[in-house]
A protein has these predicted regions:
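C-terminal edge beta-strand
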Residues: 26, 107-119
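Solvent-exposed, low-complexity, repeat-rich "mucin-like" stalks and linkers
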Residues: 37-62
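A short beta-strand micro-motif common to beta-rich folds, especially ectodomain repeats
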Residues: 57, 93-106
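Strand-loop-strand motifs at the edges of beta-sheets in extracellular beta-sandwich domains
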Residues: 75-91
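Aromatic-lined carbohydrate-binding/catalytic grooves of carbohydrate-active enzymes
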Residues: 133, 147, 151-265
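Glycan-recognition surfaces
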Residues: 238, 288-401
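Carbohydrate-binding surface patches
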Residues: 383, 389-392, 397-399, 434-474, ...
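C-terminal beta-strand-rich structural cap/linker in extracellular carbohydrate-active enzymes
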Residues: 491-517
Length: 517
């Protein structure tokens, strides 16, 4: 094949109007998964020696599917019918290379899965669901169980979503207004109590685990959380032991009322103190608990969050409380987060907040109304949102109503090629190639030598955007693939251009062409 520059040819391929834009309708770009069994999910996974291990192999395809795992350590057991791996991580540190296999009547597939036993968890960004922007303080045990059920039945778990996380609202509320959530916050021994909406936290975690999923919890280092429910101040050791005994696998630690016990003008040491404390305590537990620091980016947390034991840290304030007249909030939050790429990597991730798509509540009115309405974001804005989070190796936590999932939202959440960008084992956050008031270009190197690139139009009208291979640090001929449609587009040398809709995105993957094919 002639390898001469083919920019003009590529442009003629790219300029199919419906290829990128979903603005006029809620066009589902993600293809339906094929009928044959296909193993999805990360290719690397961190665990601590001897700790309890649970992992559900993400797999699409027509059921029933039969699973196998070559090279699985002897301390672990795979259920061949459910694909759930349980047991305990090996006592010996090191990397255990496992080949995950899945087969059904339509075909089979396999995927390398490296279990790295050591001190680092979350070697890829955590994925799951958090209730806050849907239920706020009205969350219940029933809501969490339904969410776990829906994570399986919707197919989200088949693409790697695994954490089912309850935010604030499970604890006893200290303001005493509602007897259902009021009462004594701790038992006579000082152990934290859930409110009456959560009759048995250990049973809830077990319910989630029985599906092969993981359970997440929330508290504050202050006396109370942001809605006056019990915090962990001066009970850090006891609470960490309780959370581990209940069986929780993830802890979000929200600054909230810690302001009332910190100095009026806190130093960096003051800001670090509660997170250093809890991070050290969690490491002493006999359970793997991913630690999520939520203190809104104060004190440049990205420079010290990993040293405090954090696996992810919020880089800004709440996305749901951010407003802007020009751009949707996710753009402003994302652009801030994008500048911090050098601080992210395996086991420690910049967290720009949750995916507020689907049906969500109003963060400004949550105390007055529990109504959950469809997001006001346009379809193109939603594609931009998920594309940006994936390029930035952000934790992917859906925060919409799990009971109101529709096909369009599932298409956004469950595109295996887009998720692979987020979960890539190299663990690089995309770097900013170009940033202006009108456009943003992000580039993320991937483990196989390819690069994922997002071209984001920040203006209120369509505009032509161009990226050259020189801009991207690439050379020679490159194959170009549309990640949302999961289709090869063509080949390019030099540069490529395309008209991008308002607030829209082009998300592509460049791979070196092989000479002599």
């Amino acid at each position: 094949m002639n390898r001469a520059p083919i920019t003009a040819l590529l442009l003629s391929v790219l300029c199919v109007p419906q290829l990128w834009s979903a603005e006029s309708t809620r066009q589902i770009l993600t293809p339906k998964p094929p009928a044959e069994a296909r193993v999805n999910g990360p290719t690397i996974y961190g665990a601590r020696p001897g700790h309890q291990f649970i992992y559900r192999i993400p797999c699409t395809g027509e059921r029933p599917v039969r699973f196998a795992a070559q090279g699985l350590p002897a301390s672990l057991h795979l259920d061949p019918l459910t694909g759930i791996i349980t047991g305990h991580a090996p006592d010996k540190t090191g990397t255990y290379a496992v080949t995950l296999q899945a087969s059904n009547s339509n075909g089979r597939s396999s995927r390398l899965f490296r279990i790295v036993v050591g001190d680092t968890l979350a070697l890829t960004p955590p994925m799951g669901w958090n209730d806050w922007y849907s239920y706020y303080e009205q969350v219940t045990d029933k809501v969490m169980r339904q969410a776990a059920d829906r994570m399986i039945s919707s197919g989200m778990a088949d693409f790697g979503y695994q954490y089912v996380n309850v935010d604030g609202g499970w604890q006893v509320n200290t303001n005493g207004k509602d007897p259902e959530v009021g009462g004594e916050p701790r038992d006579p021994q000082g152990n934290i109590r859930p409110n009456r909406r959560f009759p048995d936290m250990q049973a809830l975690a077990a319910y989630i685990h029985n599906k092969g999923l993981k359970a997440g919890l929330y508290t504050s280092p202050g006396p109370v959380d942001c809605a006056d429910s019990t915090g962990s101040y001066q009970h850090e050791e006891a609470d960490a032991r309780t959370f581990a005994a209940w069986g929780f696998d993830f802890l979000k630690y929200d600054w909230c009322s810690y302001t009332t016990v910190a100095p009026a003008k806190p130093t960096l040491a003051d800001m670090r103190k509660p997170y250093d404390l809890m991070g050290g305590i969690l490491k002493k537990q006999d359970r793997d608990i991913v630690f999520n620091l939520c203190q809104y980016g104060m004190g440049d947390v990205w420079t010290w969050g990993a040293d405090a034991g954090g696996n992810a840290w919020r880089t800004t304030g709440d996305l749901g409380m951010t407003k802007d007249d020009r751009l949707p909030a996710f753009y402003n939050i994302g652009i801030t987060n994008a500048a911090l790429s050098s601080y992210a990597g395996p086991g420690h991730w910049n967290d720009p907040d949750y995916l507020l798509i689907g049906n969500v509540g109003d963060a400004f009115k949550w105390e007055q109304s529990q109504e959950r309405l469809p997001t006001s974001l346009t379809p193109d804005e939603q594609y931009s949102y998920v594309s940006m989070w994936s390029l930035m190796a952000a934790p992917l936590f859906f925060a919409g109503d799990m009971t109101a999932l529709d096909d369009f939202t599932l298409g956004l959440l469950c595109n295996s090629e887009v998720i692979d960008v987020d979960q890539d084992a190299l663990g690089w956050q995309a770097r900013v190639i170009r940033r202006s008031p009108d456009e943003l270009i992000l580039e993320k190197p991937l483990e196989d030598g390819s690069v994922a690139v997002g071209l984001f139009n920040l203006t209120g009208s369509s505009r032509k955007m161009t990226a050259s291979l020189t801009d991207l640090g690439l050379s020679g001929g490159q194959k170009l693939r549309d990640l949302w449609r999961q289709k090869e587009i063509g080949e390019v040398t030099g540069s490529f251009s395309h008209e991008v809709t308002r607030h829209g995105v082009i998300l592509v993957r460049f791979s070196p062409m092989r000479i002599g094919r």
